[in-house]
A protein has these predicted regions:
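Histidine-anchored nucleotide/phosphate-binding helix
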Residues: 19-33
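C-terminal structural segments of small proteins and small subunits
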Residues: 88-114
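Short, glycine-rich nucleotide/cofactor-binding loops
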Residues: 6-20, 52
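N-terminal beta-loop-helix "entrance" segment that forms/cooperates
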Residues: 44-58
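Aromatic- and Gly/Pro-rich donor/ligand-binding loops
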Residues: 119-120
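Anion (oxyanion) recognition and catalysis
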Residues: 30-31, 72, 112
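A glycine-rich helix N-cap at a beta->alpha junction
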Residues: 54-87
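Short internal beta-strands
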Residues: 36-41, 78-82
Length: 121
């Protein structure tokens, strides 16, 4: 059984429900003691900026900021597409502590040869 998970997210706060679902999956994996990596591309790269992930998708949904805190507390990591990040003229000194710029090569290095559960949103 895979002990690691990769969640790929392309959507930012323009679709807070999709972001919330992706974070619920990531938090579940990380809190379930799986090494967890969220690969953020397109508008999702903004979610790795300190203080940006603030939204509540729907009535009854947990606030995104709470999910981000739980993800970090459980050891979850973000890998942020550097092409997407640079295209949006964002500053990497604003990244949260558990985020790093890195593309597909570092993602595949992280995956390695062991089985990994993947989700894409």
């Amino acid at each position: 059984m895979p002990t690691r998970a990769v969640i790929s997210l392309t959507t930012g706060l323009e679709d807070p429900e999709k972001v919330t679902v992706a974070f619920l999956v990531a938090v579940g994996a990380a809190e379930g003691h799986r090494e967890t990596l969220m690969f953020l591309t397109k508008e999702a790269v903004r979610l790795a900026l300190d203080g940006f992930a603030k939204a509540t998708a729907c009535e009854g949904c947990p606030p995104l900021a709470e999910l981000v805190k739980r993800y970090e507390a459980a050891g979850g990591r973000f890998l942020v597409c550097p092409i997407c990040f640079t295209a949006r003229h964002l500053a990497d000194d604003g990244l949260v502590a558990n985020a790093a710029l890195g593309g597909t090569v570092p993602m595949w290095e992280w995956i390695g040869d062991e089985p990994v559960t993947t989700f894409s949103y």
